[in-house]
Amino acid sequence: MTPSIDLRTFHSLQPARQHLLDVYTDVRADLLHLPNYAVTAFAERLDRHFKEPGWVAVLAYEQDKPIGYAYANTVDSEDRWWKRITPAPPAEYTDRHVVALKEIGVRLPWRGTGIARQIHDTLLAARNEPFVTLMVNPLAGDGKVHRLYESWGYEDLGQSQPSPASPVLTAMVKSIP
């Protein structure tokens, strides 16, 4: 019998922080030498994002071991999220509150099992915003990650480079059913 997956939602960072860091470290192990992917850089972003409106995280556990995560927060028309995307996104997205999916990751043994989609959908299920946006490195997995998001209904919106150490990312958006 396959162990069941337990999805837990967190609205506070403290009880989830170490598990988020642990899974991130495992998921991004081959990139941790790059400044943007260093655990310290992720921890700084995580702490900053938690202070932003609407923060929520979902962690997946198998037998109490964290195996995947996603976290998001709300962005509005004045948020730097939108200001860094070129070309400028349509007002249809920027003139309202939307969910920004900041991070999602699943440990290697559980990739390709649908866990990422379960985490994603659980995170969005309780949201009231009409759209969700994310940024993806179009080179991740030789384009596989971008194609996965397209299969989930996301469409390209533009490009963004959130920091000088960051790769150029593709901003994507989709409606929340």
Which positions does each model-derived feature cover?
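Conserved acetyl-CoA-binding loop-helix of GNAT-fold acetyltransferases
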Residues: 100-108, 112-125, 147-151
